């Protein structure tokens, strides 16, 4: 299984993994060296797909899609790093509060 990238660009934002424990990760999100916010995610396992025409997409780890935020992903403003860190800790404990 291909692991989720530690840095990637999506929709004009640069995502950088700050920490990861198991299938939970904390990413910064922004442009260049400016951080606009943080995202705590539960990483998905995406199975191999075979497309029409025979192209194969190997099994890989995936980022939650837009519809999964609030369930598998949480966004925090730039000033909310403490809240993002707390959510990261909570998710690494299986969603249990401190």
Language model segments and positions:
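A short, exposed loop/beta-hairpin motif centered on an aromatic-Gly-Thr core
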Residues: 63-83
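Short intrinsically disordered terminal tails
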Residues: 1-3, 90-98
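Amphipathic alpha-helical interaction segments
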Residues: 46, 82-84, 96
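Short N-terminal "domain-start" leader segments
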Residues: 1-62
């Amino acid at each position: 299984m291909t692991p989720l990238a530690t840095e990637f660009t999506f929709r004009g934002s640069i995502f950088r993994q700050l920490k990861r424990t198991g299938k939970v990760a904390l990413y910064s999100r922004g442009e260049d060296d400016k951080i606009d916010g943080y995202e705590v995610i539960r990483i998905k396992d995406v199975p191999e797909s075979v497309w029409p025409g025979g192209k194969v997409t190997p099994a890989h780890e995936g980022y939650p899609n837009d519809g999964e935020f609030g369930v598998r992903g949480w966004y925090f403003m730039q000033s909310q790093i403490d809240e993002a860190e707390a959510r990261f800790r909570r998710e690494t404990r299986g969603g249990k509060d401190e």
